[in-house]
Amino acid sequence: MEQDKYLTVAAITKYIEKKFEVDPYMKQVFVRGEISNLKQPASGHLYFTVKDEFAMLRSVMFHKAVQKIGFVPEDGMNVLITGRIGVFTKAGRYQFYAEHMEPDGVGALYIQLEQLKSQLEKEGLFAETHKKVLPSFPSKVAVVTSKTGAAVRDILTTIHRRMPSVEVIVYPTIVQGEKAAQKIVENIGKINQRNDIDVMIIGRGGGSLEELWAFNEEPVVRAVYDSDVPVISAVGHETDFALSDFSADVRAATPTAAAELAVPDYRDLEERLAERKYRLLAVTRQALERKERSLEQLKQHLILNGPKHQLEQQMERTDYFSERLNNAFSKQIFVKQTVFDRLNDRLHYYHPNKEIELQKEQMALRLQALEKAMKQLLKDKQQSFFRQIDALEHLSPLSLLKRGFGVTYKENMLVKSVQELEVGDNIQVKMQGGQIEALITAKEEDISGN
């Protein structure tokens, strides 16, 4: 029948599909072009168009193949793609089924490196706030590198030269190849399981991007970031950078520089110790000189205001008043004697014997009373003087010291109340027989306010 020569749409599409399947040139096709109209739904497949200035080719890459490409394709990126040509029957069009893809022009490793760097930087793995401070005086240093080569020799030689007492523990590892990243991560984990490693150095000598790639792999970068032991990354030479340099606590330009960062030079320490010893001696000498001046001032103060000086002044006053009292007493006696002599002369003149006897008796009594009064006055003055002396001695700082009390000073100033002191203050306590210095470790104020 006439109608038998007509094919269905499905049949012709199936025929074309078979043609592509049996054509050896369509089974493995190498395509170079620019990605456009890129889409990636939840399934993880990539749908895009590969084009050049003359044509375009609809393409698809399934999720399993996408996971193997190692970078993130983007619109406008020039790529090299390997795959096959087939037919999408439902849409009735041929398309390119991509199985492998890599960037064209710039190597895939560079693209992958930049994309991983951007991702990890956004996560905060390179943040300065996370970086740990290297210990000043490590006793054990771990080194993760190849057991042969210049890197390990340079590190060992430099550490031994700068600080021979530091123990270096080498964790040999392969530093390039497919298993290098896994071995590096394992060794970082072993070091963190110990509790006696102060700092670790990871790295190798210089090389190409491919040779240094293990230190760019995400597991290594994350292991360096997560390490509790401070990490110095020394990958390559000054112009070489790896992502482990950014996640490490410190980046060293070379393995030798890493060793110099890890340990101090004992000769520098000796110079610093000598300088600090000199400064300490100078400060101590100045402090002693200040204390000696303060002690001398205190001695002068005690000499001028102490009980001995006060006693000497009171004794001088007592002598002065005693002399005045004696002079007054002598003057009174002289006056009375003069009166007596006059009266005696008059008595002799008038010969009043009875009156004379009476006057003599009265005079004697008066003289006796006067002498008694003068003696009592002198005794009272002396008793008052000695009471004042006792009071002065009782109030004297030296008397208080003899009874077990102490006088407290802070920065050469007399402390009168606990409120003038704070925890951590240095104080000086003057006691019987000398002086002590103390540090306030606790403070308790009297709640009564006294």
UniProtKB/Swiss-Prot annotation:
GO biological process, one term: DNA catabolic process
Keywords from the named record: Cytoplasm, Exonuclease, Hydrolase, Nuclease
InterPro entries associated with the record: Exonuc_VII_L (IPR003753), Exonuc_VII_lsu_C (IPR020579), OB-fold_nuc-bd_dom (IPR025824)
Keyword Transmembrane: no
Single Gene Ontology MF annotation: nucleic acid binding
Transmembrane segment boundaries: none
Primary subcellular site in the record, as a coarse category: cytoplasm
CDD domains: ExoVII_LU_OBF
Catalysed reactions, semicolon-separated: Exonucleolytic cleavage in either 5'- to 3'- or 3'- to 5'-direction to yield nucleoside 5'-phosphates
GO CC, alphabetical: cytoplasm; exodeoxyribonuclease VII complex
Localization per Swiss-Prot or TrEMBL: Cytoplasm
Enzyme class: hydrolase
EC number(s) from the headed UniProt entry: 3.1.11.6
UniProt cross-references to Pfam families, sorted A to Z: Exonuc_VII_L (PF02601), tRNA_anti_2 (PF13742)
Binding partners and assembly: Heterooligomer composed of large and small subunits.
Function per UniProt: Bidirectionally degrades single-stranded DNA into large acid-insoluble oligonucleotides, which are then degraded further into small acid-soluble oligonucleotides.
Family to which the UniProt record says this protein belongs: Belongs to the XseA family.
Protein name, per record: Exodeoxyribonuclease 7 large subunit
Source organism: Listeria monocytogenes serotype 4b (strain CLIP80459)
